[in-house]
Swiss-Prot record:
Protein name: Palmitoyltransferase PFA3
Class of this enzyme: transferase
EC number: 2.3.1.225
Taxonomic lineage of the native organism: Eukaryota, Fungi, Dikarya, Ascomycota, Saccharomycotina
Compartments, as annotated in UniProt: Vacuole membrane
Organism, scientific name: Debaryomyces hansenii (strain ATCC 36239 / CBS 767 / BCRC 21394 / JCM 1990 / NBRC 0083 / IGC 2968) (Yeast)
Domain notes: The DHHC domain is required for palmitoyltransferase activity.
Encoding gene, per UniProt annotation: PFA3
GO cellular component, one term: vacuolar membrane
A GO term, aspect molecular function: protein-cysteine S-palmitoyltransferase activity
Ranges in the topological domain labelled Cytoplasmic: 1-27, 84-214, 273-405
Record's keyword annotation contains Membrane: yes
Ranges in the topological domain labelled Lumenal: 49-62, 236-251
TM ranges: 28-48, 63-83, 215-235, 252-272
Length: 405
């Protein structure tokens, strides 16, 4: 009779699972409720206490107050709409495409799995997944037909860092397109993953990246607008010494403080996000470049080349097509798409450059990456041969010393 530990039994009890699910739901719901509440309160403070109570004192200022109220209300609607547009669109995942799903993940663990990719220099590839196959009782793994990425739908340029095989996810059982990463929080792979945002309780990826950038821009503009309006009201209130016979609503004071804080923080993050858009780079790729830079200083990175004068320079980003093309590839082809939260993506498997599976690249930079990868492979092979030769010479010398005759 198998007796489980009490802690294990309690942890897997149905009521414990229900409590965990409820707590996760609350944690996911909190940022949405908090953001909506704060944003709605701000527009209330702006229109009611700022425009109606303070500015609508004479006929001349009434028109000005109405204009301020309409501008603030428009920015409020755009901020709220883009926020929920990010949630509704979602980041996108390879799991959404039947063609990218792997029928049998063990077929990729075959010792004779060959991949026809530009970096592949080895015919055979031993992986740890074959051990997993034996552990699960798959004795005849050679009889499993090896799967290959669907080349008719997906053109790959990024490979696994530890070998020359195409990237795939063992948790989601899908092929991973370029710039795709697995999110441990969402527990799924995300197309062109930028980052996981706690304020959305969701990842920012290919399908909602544009709306996320617009959300940051709208929120920065709205915060700056509230800050200017509340500052002017407070300045006039104290400059004209109205505090002697008038009361000032604390809502305007709180609006001034919060709008200033949001304008600085969100504005800084918005500037950083727009910089990445113009460079066609995700937050993950930006962070990877920082790690590579640190490794480069320690002599552990080879993502550079030497020019004619012998100076070292970086290879560059294969997805960087120039500021204009980078911007249009994410935000849309014209100013109409740039200003309004209009969808520019396509969730069809046949939409080559609009579904998050394929991306335009700088062919010249990509060729240099391939050439550099081949040189690295040759250097690694020469180093391995040298170490093997030294080891054999040492073993031969030891044999000679132990047997002089």
């Amino acid at each position: 009779m198998l007796i489980s530990h009490p802690r294990i039994m309690i942890r897997h009890a149905p009521w414990v699972t229900s409590i965990e699910t409820f707590c996760c739901s609350l944690a996911t719901l909190f940022p949405k409720v908090f953001y909506t509440s704060v944003l709605t309160w701000s527009v209330y403070a702006l229109i009611v206490h700022g425009c109606y109570d303070t500015l609508m004192t004479t006929q001349e200022t009434s028109i000005f107050a109405i204009a301020i109220g309409l501008i603030g209300l428009t920015l409020y609607i755009l901020c709220l709409y883009t926020y929920f547009k990010v949630l509704r669109a979602g980041p996108g995942s390879p799991s959404d495409f039947e063609e990218l799903r792997i029928r049998n993940i063990l077929s990729l663990s075959k010792p004779k799995y060959n991949s026809a990719n530009p970096y592949d220099t080895n015919d055979n590839m031993a992986t740890s997944a074959s051990l997993l196959a034996n552990a699960e009782g798959v004795d005849e793994i050679e009889s499993i037909e090896s799967e290959q990425p669907p080349s008719e739908y997906m053109t790959l340029h990024m490979l696994k860092s530890n070998n020359s095989s195409y990237r795939y996810c063992t948790k989601c059982s899908v092929w991973k397109p370029d710039r795709c990463h697995h999110c441990s929080t969402c527990n799924r792979c995300v197309l062109r993953m930028d980052h996981h945002c706690p304020w959305f309780a969701m990842c920012v990826g290919f399908y909602n990246h544009k709306f996320f950038a617009q959300f940051l821009m709208y929120l920065t503009a709205y915060s700056g607008f509230d800050f200017v309006v509340s500052l002017s009201i407070l300045w006039k209130f104290f400059a004209d010494e109205k505090y002697n016979d008038h009361y000032l609503s604390l809502n305007l004071v709180f609006l001034f403080v919060l709008s200033l804080a949001f304008f600085i923080t969100v504005g800084g993050f918005s500037a950083f996000s727009l910089y990445l858009v113009f460079r066609n780079k995700t937050t993950i790729e930006f962070q990877e470049n920082r790690w590579n830079f640190k490794n480069d200083k320690n002599g552990k990175s080879f993502q550079y080349e030497f020019d004619g004068s012998g100076k070292k320079k970086k290879l560059g980003n294969i997805f960087d097509l120039g500021c204009g093309r980078n911007w249009r590839s994410i935000m849309g082809p014209s100013w109409y798409y740039w200003l309004l939260p209009v969808t520019v993506t396509n969730k069809s498997i046949d939409a080559r450059l609009e579904n998050g599976i394929n991306f335009e690249i700088d062919q010249d930079v990509y060729d240099r990456w391939c050439y550099n990868a081949q040189l690295q492979d040759q250097l690694n092979q020469q180093l391995a041969d040298y170490k093997n030769r030294i080891r054999m010479e040492r073993e031969a010398n030891q044999t000679t010393d132990t047997n002089p005759f």
